């Protein structure tokens, strides 16, 4: 995923590099945008697109390889997956190229991006666009109920990135151990009450990891009367006032956690293993299909099920974006448009492949294309669209940074 576990390092890295370049988007635009899609297709033929994407998930890597095969066969476009450990690698490469005056022929054609990395590129004039309105499949994007397709961590996307897939917080439990669905906790207070009845059977990843920090964000959303305040940057005063109820709640929860709240799994994979080993009963994931995919792959028992909170859960969109100096922008546009196609979106949503939530408004699709989604691999662990509900928007990124730092200060003192 583009948002990597090391929150402080990425934030400091991008902040330290931002003085190197200007903030005027117009200065970053070096080529004329063409609304003639046939011309774009023609120019793309024979190009090699260097798609810079996080490579930490083999299912995603396989999907990118499949998309490359499809583009080669249909449009004569070669896709090379530049495998990243951290999206900031690609961002800093574009920053360095701009600082060196390399305003064309750049080494990054397309990058999987969101969050602080997208904000940095958008603010610093590193993006080609607005590109989304030029793609034929942009008309299929859901901009009503999937608001994160338009707003990325409070930053308006404004067509400078193309939605690819959705993520949303879900909770996973083993129905063999929690057999009564009425006992499943669906709020922060119910989660605390459940933990009191079942001490040691709940945990969350370390908030130095993105998923652990998101657990804190989600619980804060549960406990504040107006989550809108978190759409603004956190200040010392607002953070202290707004986060107070969270820490009061967490001080009660922590002793009831796995290993007395003295140790935490490093990431989602480690937390999932604890569920599989029977050490805990509930986990969380940013992939609604995680339980279904893991059960199908033997990493979780077949009895796992998925639930969300009564007031909803946080969701965000992964995007692809084209740097301002991309050597093969036309090929990158063709790839981005293909990723929006019903064919690609349905394959990505199938738990045999990625299990990601689509970014489309299915009501806009012709019947034949809608049928692709009706034929997806079923699973009792897979939540329905109604189960997920409308995702809550991510708060401003400053809240995540402060929550992770404050948790560390309180926990390690």
Residue ranges of model-derived segments:
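Periplasmic-binding protein-like
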Residues: 250-253, 264, 300-321
């Amino acid at each position: 995923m583009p948002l990597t576990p090391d929150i402080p390092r990425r934030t400091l890295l991008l902040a330290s590099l931002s003085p190197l370049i200007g903030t005027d988007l117009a200065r970053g635009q070096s080529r004329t945008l063409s609304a003639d899609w046939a011309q774009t297709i023609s120019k793309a033929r024979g190009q090699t697109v260097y798609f810079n994407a996080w490579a930490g998930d083999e299912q995603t890597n396989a999907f990118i390889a499949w998309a490359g095969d499809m583009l080669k066969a249909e449009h004569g476009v070669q896709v090379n997956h530049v495998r990243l450990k951290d999206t900031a690698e690609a961002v800093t490469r574009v920053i360095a190229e701009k600082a060196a005056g390399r305003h064309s022929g750049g080494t990054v054609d397309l990058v999987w991006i969101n969050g602080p990395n997208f904000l940095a590129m958008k603010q610093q004039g590193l993006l080609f666009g607005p590109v989304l309105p030029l793609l034929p499949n942009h008309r299929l994007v859901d901009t009503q109920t999937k608001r994160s397709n338009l707003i990325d961590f409070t930053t308006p996307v404004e067509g400078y990135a193309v939605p690819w897939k959705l993520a949303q917080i879900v909770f996973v439990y083993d129905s063999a151990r929690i057999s009564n669905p009425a006992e499943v906790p669906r709020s922060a207070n119910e989660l605390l009450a459940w933990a009191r009845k079942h001490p040691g059977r709940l945990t969350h990843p370390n908030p130095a990891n993105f998923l652990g920090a998101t657990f804190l964000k989600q619980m804060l959303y549960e406990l504040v009367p107006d989550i809108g305040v978190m759409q603004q940057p956190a200040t010392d005063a607002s953070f202290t006032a707004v986060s107070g109820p969270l820490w009061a709640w967490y001080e009660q929860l922590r002793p009831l956690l796995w290993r007395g709240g003295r140790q935490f799994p490093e990431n989602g994979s480690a937390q999932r293993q604890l569920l599989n080993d029977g050490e805990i009963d509930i986990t969380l994931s940013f992939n609604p299909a995680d339980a279904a995919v893991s059960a199908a792959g033997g990493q979780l028992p077949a009895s796992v099920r998925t639930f969300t909170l009564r007031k909803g859960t946080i969701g965000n969109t992964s995007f692809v974006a084209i740097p301002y100096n991309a050597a093969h922008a036309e090929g990158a546009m063709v790839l981005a448009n293909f990723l929006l196609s019903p064919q690609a979106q349905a394959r990505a949503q199938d738990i045999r492949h990625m299990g990601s939530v689509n970014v489309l408004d299915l009501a806009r699709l012709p019947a034949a294309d809608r049928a692709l989604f009706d034929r997806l691999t079923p699973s009792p662990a897979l939540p329905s669209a109604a189960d997920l509900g409308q995702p809550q928007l991510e708060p401003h990124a400053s809240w995540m940074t402060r929550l992770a730092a404050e948790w560390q200060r309180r926990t390690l003192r």
